[in-house]
């Protein structure tokens, strides 16, 4: 068996990892802007306060600059808004990541908050798959339907093209459960998207593509 050299002979310049995606349906109008190499700055307007708080965790703990503006049919409920933000954010990530050359690809994180503990593992595999277990102790948090956590991550996974395992391992307070999930997700993203200086310009797969 023969293998090509892992690292190219000359270093490749790091491409700009930003994206802007707009999505309009009869239910929502959304614009998302991301900078994967940011500082954690966020401007978030979904109309759902607790959801904005969770999205802020992605920005802050992932060191991702994130701007989301959403006008959704909240007079019905938050389902379309939360799901469609996940879809649009996933599309923006896919565009910003590009061909995945030089990234570490895999990331994981454990995050505690008082009694709650969550683990998230992500693989930028190009194969969408969500495996989620969060035994929420309440049906809503500040008007946010906890069932929509699944809808957000399913939308993201399908359009970012990632495999995502989410497990809330412990928790009594539903706010703490949800917050540890989003913080761990952010930290896992940050690890997976970090550029590996020893594999600059190389796609992290023996197949040569992802």
UniProtKB/Swiss-Prot annotation:
Compartment list: Cytoplasm
Biological process per Gene Ontology, one example term: L-histidine biosynthetic process
GO CC terms: cytoplasm
Enzyme category, top tier: lyase
InterPro entries assigned to the protein according to its UniProt record, in alphabetical order: IGPD_sf, ImidazoleglycerolP_deHydtase, ImidazoleglycerP_deHydtase_CS, Ribosomal_Su5_D2-typ_SF
Keyword check for Amino-acid biosynthesis: yes
Catalytic activity: D-erythro-1-(imidazol-4-yl)glycerol 3-phosphate = 3-(imidazol-4-yl)-2-oxopropyl phosphate + H2O
Keyword entries, A-Z: Amino-acid biosynthesis, Cytoplasm, Histidine biosynthesis, Lyase
Pfam families named in the record: IGPD
PROSITE patterns the record matches: IGP_DEHYDRATASE_1 (PS00954), IGP_DEHYDRATASE_2 (PS00955)
Keyword Cytoplasm: yes
Molecular function per GO: imidazoleglycerol-phosphate dehydratase activity
Pathway named in the protein's UniProt entry: Amino-acid biosynthesis; L-histidine biosynthesis; L-histidine from 5-phospho-alpha-D-ribose 1-diphosphate: step 6/9
E.C. code: 4.2.1.19
SUPFAM superfamilies named in the record: Ribosomal protein S5 domain 2-like (SSF54211)
Family: Belongs to the imidazoleglycerol-phosphate dehydratase family.
Protein name listed in UniProt: Imidazoleglycerol-phosphate dehydratase
Species per Swiss-Prot/TrEMBL record: Acidovorax ebreus (strain TPSY)
Gene: hisB
């Amino acid at each position: 068996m023969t293998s090509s050299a892992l690292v190219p002979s000359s270093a490749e310049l790091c491409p700009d990892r930003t994206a802007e995606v707009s999505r309009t349906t009869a239910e929502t109008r959304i614009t998302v802007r991301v900078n994967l190499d940011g500082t954690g700055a966020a401007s978030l307007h979904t109309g759902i306060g607790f959801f904005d708080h969770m999205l802020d965790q992605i920005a802050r703990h992932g060191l991702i600059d994130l701007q989301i503006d959403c006008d959704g049919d909240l007079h019905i409920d938050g389902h379309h808004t939360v799901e469609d933000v996940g879809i649009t954010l996933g599309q923006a990530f896919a565009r910003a990541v590009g061909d995945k050359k030089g990234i570490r690809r895999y990331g994981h994180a454990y995050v505690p908050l008082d009694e709650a503990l969550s683990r998230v593992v992500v693989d930028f595999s190009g194969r969408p798959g969500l495996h989620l277990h969060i035994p929420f102790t309440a049906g809503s948090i500040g008007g946010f339907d906890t069932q929509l956590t699944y809808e957000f991550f399913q939308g993201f996974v399908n359009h970012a093209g990632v495999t995502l395992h989410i497990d809330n391992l412990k928790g009594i307070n539903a706010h703490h459960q949800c917050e540890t999930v989003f913080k761990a997700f952010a930290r896992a993203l940050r690890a997976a998207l970090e550029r590996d200086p020893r594999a600059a310009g190389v796609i992290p797969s023996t197949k040569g593509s992802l």
